[in-house]
C-alpha cells in the first residue's frame, strides 16, 4: 500500500450533539487534526494518500471509529490498539443558542499514540506533509511529547513540510508554563505555524499578530499564518509579510471547525504545488 502523502497526528473523539429530537443525541466523530484531514480529503484527488496516526481502544466504539475513518478514504492502519482504553468523548449542549462542551477523555486511547513509536516512524519517513496541533501535544505525557517532537525533527527536511496548529486549549494543560514550553518546542521543529490571534494573546500575551509571528520565527518556524476572525490574516514567510483579507461571508451557517477547514484548504493547496500565499483560502 502506498504511504500517505499527508500524515496527521492527533486525537479523534466521539461527539454527542443535539438532534431534532430533544430526548436524543446524535453520535459523530470529530477532532481538530482529523477534521483538517477530513476536509483536505474533499479537496484532494482520491488517489492522493492521507493518513491519520492516533491510538484506538479495543472496544466497539473504537471499531466504529476505525470504520468511519476508512469510509472517508483516510488510512489509519498500523496504528496502536490499547487494551482497556476507549475513545475520548465530548457532548455539545445548547442554551439560548450558545454552544458549550463537556469532555470525557481521561482514558482516551489517543493519549497513548506513542505506545509503539516504530509504527509512527515508518509513516513519518514516507509522509510529504506532516500535520499536528497543540491538542496533540496536550494529551501526551511529557516524555511522549518530547519523543514525538524529536522524531519529527529527525525527518524534517527540504522535501518535507511540517504544519503545526497551536490550537491553545488551556484546560488541557496542567499549567500555563508547561503549555508554553511545549508550544515553543513544537515551533522549533515546524515549517508552517497556523494560529489565531485570540489563542496567542491568551496563551502568550502577545500584543498583535506581528508579535506572534516574530516569536514563532525566532523559535525556528519558516512561516506563520495568524488568523483574526473576520479581520485580515497575517502571513509572514521569511522576511515577507502579507495581510490577507478573508472572503466576505454575510451569514455564516456554522463556525464549527472553521479553523480546521481553513487549514485544510492551505494544506491541500500546497500539496497541489501552490505557494503558501497562493494556497491560503
Please report, for each region that a protein language model flagged, where it lies by residue:
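Active-site glycine- and acidic-residue-rich loops that bind
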Residues: 109-111, 137-146, 170-177, 203-206
Amino acid at each position: 500500500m502506498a504511504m500517505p502523502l499527508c500524515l496527521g497526528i492527533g486525537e479523534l473523539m466521539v461527539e454527542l450533539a443535539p438532534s431534532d429530537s430533544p430526548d436524543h443525541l446524535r453520535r459523530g466523530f470529530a477532532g481538530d487534526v482529523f477534521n483538517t484531514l477530513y476536509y483536505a480529503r474533499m479537496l484532494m484527488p482520491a488517489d492522493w494518500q492521507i493518513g491519520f496516526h492516533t491510538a484506538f481502544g479495543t472496544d466497539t466504539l473504537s471499531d466504529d471509529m476505525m470504520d468511519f475513518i476508512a469510509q472517508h478514504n483516510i488510512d489509519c492502519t498500523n496504528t496502536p490498539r490499547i487494551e482497556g482504553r476507549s475513545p475520548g468523548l465530548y457532548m455539545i449542549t445548547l442554551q439560548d443558542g450558545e454552544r458549550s462542551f463537556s469532555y470525557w477523555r481521561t482514558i482516551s486511547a489517543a493519549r497513548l499514540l506513542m505506545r509503539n513509536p516504530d509504527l509512527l516512524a515508518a509513516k513519518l519517513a514516507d509522509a510529504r506533509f506532516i500535520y499536528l496541533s497543540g491538542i496533540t501535544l496536550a494529551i501526551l505525557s511529557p516524555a511522549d511529547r518530547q519523543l514525538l517532537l524529536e522524531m519529527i525533527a529527525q525527518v524534517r527536511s527540504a522535501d518535507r513540510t511540517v504544519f503545526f496548529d497551536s490550537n491553545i486549549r488551556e484546560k488541557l494543560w496542567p499549567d500555563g508554563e508547561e503549555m508554553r514550553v511545549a508550544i515553543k518546542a513544537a515551533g522549533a521543529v515546524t515549517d508552517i505555524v497556523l494560529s489565531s490571534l485570540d489563542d496567542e494573546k491568551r496563551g502568550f500575551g502577545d500584543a498583535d499578530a506581528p508579535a506572534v509571528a516574530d516569536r514563532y520565527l525566532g523559535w525556528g518556524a519558516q512561516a506563520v499564518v495568524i488568523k483574526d476572525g473576520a479581520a485580515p490574516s497575517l502571513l509572514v514567510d521569511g522576511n515577507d509579510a502579507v495581510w490577507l483579507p478573508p472572503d466576505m461571508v454575510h451569514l455564516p451557517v456554522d463556525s464549527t471547525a472553521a479553523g480546521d477547514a481553513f487549514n485544510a484548504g492551505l494544506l491541500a493547496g500546497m500539496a497541489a504545488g501552490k505557494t503558501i500565499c497562493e494556497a491560503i483560502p
